[in-house]
Design a protein with these regions (language model features):
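Tandem repeat scaffolds
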Residues: 3-221
């Protein structure tokens, strides 16, 4: 498959004739391009192993697509939706997600890499993201409520005011993450590590902990 630029050059015609022109965008590539208002679900079901570097996506929809192992490093997503999208082992390193309509909740993203990305205030509620990497991310006021984040790595992330209520955080790593004002009410924190993490104002009501849960020595919760 060639570049998605070739496929999307005349998006209106492509969507209008989607039954005849339904395409497989696996292994497609784009570099430094802008995509606006595209509902990729009307074009394809597959974007596995695709590679989009330094791209801008505005008001695009990726609902239910198979995007496993795809790379979107150094890209920007404005008001984009990933409802039920399969993002296992995908990479969004150093990328930005913003806008009131941006949505990653209910996405399936095992071991997805968001290292150095900006996900501030993004809705990731009910996402399935065990083993995913949020290392040094901006997660200010991000919504992770009800998500499966077992074994996820939040090292050095700025997660002030983030919502982890009811989340599965067993074995998660919060080393040096800024968690001031974060809400862990009802979260499963068995085996989670909070070493050297600021926790001022964080809420842990009804959170589940065990002997393997590691909290900074100054916090007696």
């Amino acid at each position: 498959m060639g570049s998605i630029i070739m496929v999307a050059r005349d998006v209106d015609d492509l969507v209008e004739n989607s039954i005849e022109d339904y395409v497989n965008l696996s292994q497609s590539t784009a570099d430094g391009q802008t995509f606006e208002g595209i509902n990729f679900g009307l074009i394809t079901s597959y974007m596995q192993d695709a590679n989009y570097t330094d791209c801008l996506f505005k008001e695009c929809k990726f609902r239910g697509l198979h995007m496993e192992h795809a790379k979107f490093d150094n890209s920007e997503f404005v008001d984009c939706r990933f409802d039920l999208t399969k993002l296992d082992d995908a990479s969004f390193r150093n990328s930005s997600f913003r806008g009131g309509d941006v949505y990653l909740g209910s996405a399936i993203m095992t071991c997805t890499d968001f290292t150095y990305s900006n996900l501030a205030s993004v809705d990731l509620s009910r996402a399935y993201a065990p083993g995913s990497l949020f290392v040094e991310c901006d997660l200010d006021k991000t919504n992770f409520s009800g998500s499966n984040l077992r074994g996820a790595n939040f090292s050095r992330a700025d997660a002030r005011g983030s919502d982890f209520t009811g989340a599965d955080l067993r074995g998660a790593n919060f080393f040096r993450a800024d968690l001031r004002g974060a809400n862990f009410t009802g979260a499963d924190l068995r085996g989670a590590s909070f070493r050297s993490a600021p926790l001022d104002g964080a809420q842990f009501d009804e959170a589940i902990m065990d002997d393997l849960t590691t909290l900074p020595g100054e916090y007696g919760i």
